[in-house]
Amino acid sequence: TSIFETAGVGQPAYATIGAGVVNTVFTLVSVFLVERAGRRTLHLLGLAGMCGCAILMTIALLLLERLPAMSYVSIVAIFGFVAFFEIGPGPIPWFIVAELFSQGPRPAAMAVAGFCNWTSNFIIGMGFQYIAXAMGPYVFLLFAVLLLAFFIFTFLKVPETR
């Protein structure tokens, strides 16, 4: 909700509900696409889309004072970010980890993946407000750079596992 408030959205609670709806819908979309498009392709698409949305969000926040309509662009960027997350980086890593490892080491690999996932979520959740206060409207560029790095890593190192 605070992200929507920063973006100048008049009713941030409704926008937050909208983000939840987008999250749910695109989780279902991912279920149907994963076998057709492939895990690696969806993961790359999701990372690229999230990176683009993070850049769009930065631009919208920078122009918000001069162009109040940028609050709508911010909503589109956030909804797009959530949608691309649910198409790729949300569910796909769990498929990849499960399919990269044979039956014996799979539980340990899944445990390490879960630990890394929840530790990262905790760090972002606890630190975002501080990073946002320090970086201002450029906070989403940090995410864009990280997403670009993850895209390059996935492109170069992660095989298709279906």
Swiss-Prot record:
Compartment(s): Cell membrane; Endomembrane system; Cytoplasm, Perinuclear region
A Gene Ontology molecular function term of the record: D-glucose uniporter activity
Maturation and modification: Sumoylated. Palmitoylated. Palmitoylation by ZDHHC7 controls the insulin-dependent translocation of GLUT4 to the plasma membrane.
Substrates-to-products reaction catalysed: D-glucose(out) = D-glucose(in)
Signal sequence coordinates: none
Residue ranges annotated as Cytoplasmic topological domain: 35-43, 97-107, 157-162
Side Extracellular, residues: 1-13, 65-75, 129-135
GO cellular component, as recorded: cytoplasmic vesicle membrane; endomembrane system; insulin-responsive compartment; perinuclear region of cytoplasm; plasma membrane
Lineage top rank: taxon: Eukaryota
Major subcellular site: membrane
Transmembrane parts of this sequence: 14-34, 44-64, 76-96, 108-128, 136-156
Residues noted as binding D-glucose in the record, renumbered to the chain: N23, E86, W94
GO biological process: D-glucose transmembrane transport; glucose import in response to insulin stimulus
Topology in the lipid bilayer: Multi-pass membrane protein
One Pfam family, short name: Sugar_tr
InterPro entries: GLUT, MFS_dom, MFS_sugar_transport-like, MFS_trans_sf, Sugar/inositol_transpt, Sugar_transporter_CS
Other notes: Insulin-stimulated phosphorylation of TBC1D4 is required for GLUT4 translocation.
Matching PANTHER family: SOLUTE CARRIER FAMILY 2, SOLUTE CARRIER FAMILY 2, FACILITATED GLUCOSE TRANSPORTER MEMBER 4
Quaternary context: Binds to DAXX. Interacts via its N-terminus with SRFBP1. Interacts with NDUFA9. Interacts with TRARG1; the interaction is required for proper SLC2A4 recycling after insulin stimulation.
Family: Belongs to the major facilitator superfamily. Sugar transporter (TC 2.A.1.1) family. Glucose transporter subfamily.
Function: Insulin-regulated facilitative glucose transporter, which plays a key role in removal of glucose from circulation. Response to insulin is regulated by its intracellular localization: in the absence of insulin, it is efficiently retained intracellularly within storage compartments in muscle and fat cells. Upon insulin stimulation, translocates from these compartments to the cell surface where it transports glucose from the extracellular milieu into the cell.
UniProt remark on domains: The dileucine internalization motif is critical for intracellular sequestration.
Protein name: Solute carrier family 2, facilitated glucose transporter member 4
Organism: Canis lupus familiaris
Gene encoding the protein: SLC2A4
